[in-house]
Amino acid sequence: MVTFKQIANGLTELYERKNADYGNSFSKSYEEFGLTSPVIRLSDKVERLKTLSKQEAKVKDESIQDTVMDIAVYAMLTLMELMNKDGK
């Protein structure tokens, strides 16, 4: 049985790998566009999830699990930005 902590650790690893590849693009976009930036990114992921729930993925690395993990990471990054902005 997978635990919450295992998933959180996996999300941390995913974030670190993607951040190494893409740099800190999320924070840069957030600085420039505010909450609009994560809303658009999350909306794109939710649309992908809706599509994947209706049909099999044509792209190998776009599974439902990958998409849900991306949504979770974007939610956490948004929370980090909000908390850092508020000084919490």
What does each model-identified segment do?
Residues 1-88:
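Intrinsically disordered, low-complexity regulatory regions
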